[in-house]
Amino acid sequence: MDRIIEKLESGWWIVSHEQKLWLPYGELPHGLAANFDLVGQRALRIGEWQGEPVWLVLQHRRHDMGSVRQVIDQDAGLFQLAGRGVQLAEFYRSHKFCGYCGHPMHPSKTEWAMLCSHCRERYYPQIAPCIIVAIRREDSILLAQHVRHRNGVHTVLAGFVEVGETLEQAVAREVMEESGIKVKNLRYVTSQPWPFPQSLMTAFMAEYDSGEIAIDPKELLEANWYHYDDLPLLPPPGTVARRLIEDTVAMCRAEYD
């Protein structure tokens, strides 16, 4: 599936190494390969954006290596492709040898997979399903400040789905573990690939059922009910968390304004 980049090759360039992304001038490289010293490198076509190919190059650059979070405020489709590139780059880097027999592996020519020529085992990129849920109580929404995000941002609750667990069960468990409350009338909203490191966010809305807020201090700094017209600092646009919050605010305004 990969090929040697030629001088006149053009498109969007996802240059990635160890979950980092090359972002010269803070943006994804776009244009001729020769302009970015990519001629002769191996590249894998991973998609198309605005009629042009999107290429993945597994390479480390000495300067301007940053996080894919830096392009989150760009178009959702381009952010999704950048996330795909970072995740694939990490998959290929971490699956050079077979976990069963220890022999070297090679990329499949027909799909995103790594193959072992010795024991015939086949590996695919791992995807970790997560739930994220906006909880409404009359004209208020539950927002929390997470321990791992000490930047003042308040967001909705989220967590990984455990083995043998449905998405609905994961919502109920995560909400209870992190905030001590029960929810009802769960409704699926949307999903978003989230490359931190390889998650798939499944987004829900729910209504408060019962209980008092009792946070898990290992997960949250604080959590509280916020009136829809008096919200704290929120996640950036383009995130599924922000969409859930805005959708909840819209529902509150339709009912209470």
UniProtKB/Swiss-Prot annotation:
Motif (Nudix box): 159-180
Residues binding a divalent metal cation 3: 174, 178, 219
Enzyme Commission no: 3.6.1.-, 3.6.1.22
Binding-site residues, a divalent metal cation 2: 174
Annotated positions binding Zn(2+): 98, 101, 116, 119
Binding site for a divalent metal cation 1: 158, 178, 219
Keyword Manganese tagged: yes
A biological-process GO annotation: NADH metabolic process
Stretches assigned to the Nudix hydrolase domain: 125-248
Pfam families: NUDIX (PF00293), Zn_ribbon_NUD (PF09297)
GO molecular function ontology, one term from the record: NADH pyrophosphatase activity
Cofactor: Mg(2+); Mn(2+); Zn(2+)
Residues annotated as binding substrate: 69, 111, 124, 192-199, 241
Coiled coil regions in record: none
InterPro entries listed in its UniProt record: NAD-cap_RNA_hydrolase_NudC, NudC-like_C, NUDIX_hydrolase-like_dom_sf, NUDIX_hydrolase_CS, NUDIX_hydrolase_dom, RNA_Hydrolase_NudC, Znr_NADH_PPase
Cofactor annotation remark: Divalent metal cations. Mg(2+) or Mn(2+). Binds 1 zinc ion per subunit.
Keywords in alphabetical order: Hydrolase, Magnesium, Manganese, Metal-binding, NAD, Zinc
Broadest EC class assigned to this enzyme: hydrolase
GO cellular component: cytosol
Catalysed reactions, semicolon-separated: a 5'-end NAD(+)-phospho-ribonucleoside in mRNA + H2O = a 5'-end phospho-adenosine-phospho-ribonucleoside in mRNA + beta-nicotinamide D-ribonucleotide + 2 H(+); NAD(+) + H2O = beta-nicotinamide D-ribonucleotide + AMP + 2 H(+); NADH + H2O = reduced beta-nicotinamide D-ribonucleotide + AMP + 2 H(+)
Assigned protein family: Belongs to the Nudix hydrolase family. NudC subfamily.
Function: mRNA decapping enzyme that specifically removes the nicotinamide adenine dinucleotide (NAD) cap from a subset of mRNAs by hydrolyzing the diphosphate linkage to produce nicotinamide mononucleotide (NMN) and 5' monophosphate mRNA. The NAD-cap is present at the 5'-end of some mRNAs and stabilizes RNA against 5'-processing. Has preference for mRNAs with a 5'-end purine. Catalyzes the hydrolysis of a broad range of dinucleotide pyrophosphates.
Self-association state and partner proteins as the record states: Homodimer.
Protein name: NAD-capped RNA hydrolase NudC
